[in-house]
């Protein structure tokens, strides 16, 4: 499952997915409406505005479903 699909499927009220990279970084992607905010170890890295770009970011940062 792509990260964008996983976030879209969450029904808990907080639309976020957290995973750990092989290097030990804790990654988080949160859906804030028109964009996603991505974090590494609690620090914001930036905003991503499309599901395709989010999935590219996720693949580059070792996200696995």
Question: Which role does the model predict for each range below?
Answer:
Residues 3-6, 54:
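Short amphipathic alpha-helical segments that mediate assembly, nucleic-acid/protein binding
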Residues 1-3, 61-65:
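Short intrinsically disordered terminal tails
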Residues 12-59:
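Acidic, low-complexity, intrinsically disordered interaction modules
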């Amino acid at each position: 499952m792509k990260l964008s699909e996983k976030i879209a499927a969450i029904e808990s009220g907080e639309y976020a997915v957290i995973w750990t990279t092989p290097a030990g970084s804790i990654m988080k992607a949160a859906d804030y409406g028109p964009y996603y905010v991505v974090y590494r170890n609690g620090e914001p890295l930036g905003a991503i505005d499309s599901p395709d770009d989010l999935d590219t970011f996720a693949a580059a940062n070792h996200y696995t479903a």
